[in-house]
């Protein structure tokens, strides 16, 4: 899941992955940098979790938030070794990843931290905890995922807010009526693209 999440953000050009959790270590599952050099920490939770995940990711943010550029550069070097990536100093790799005209200065790295918890869309306790800390001003967010079984294969999706809290979409059914289909079968798609829910006209 960490691989897929990292690939999702990298494809969008939003983040640069610099670290992935080592087995049996008290570490975030994934660390990345944004365009401004700020650190983004991901904690992935499978199914509904027991305990306080938000406090756990705060501990990670406290620990990693104190790391210097040189600490991050060392972590990135180990990440490159592990995944057989070309060796490059972090600030130069960051410049290339985001297409910057010049590399950031050392002091511009890790000035701010953002915590992201990735969890099941049905875990209402976790969603509530994240919403609470966000309301207190913490830079924390929740990314929901949902797992599907199609045939003999499992699929999962990450999706954006607003999101529902049901494990399976079939638990909440909806019906779309296209009363204009006989006149213009493509008009419904134009309405979707324009965020139009209802269109009325005189007969």
Residue ranges and their predicted role:
Residues 1-203:
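Charged, terminal alpha-helix-loop-beta segments
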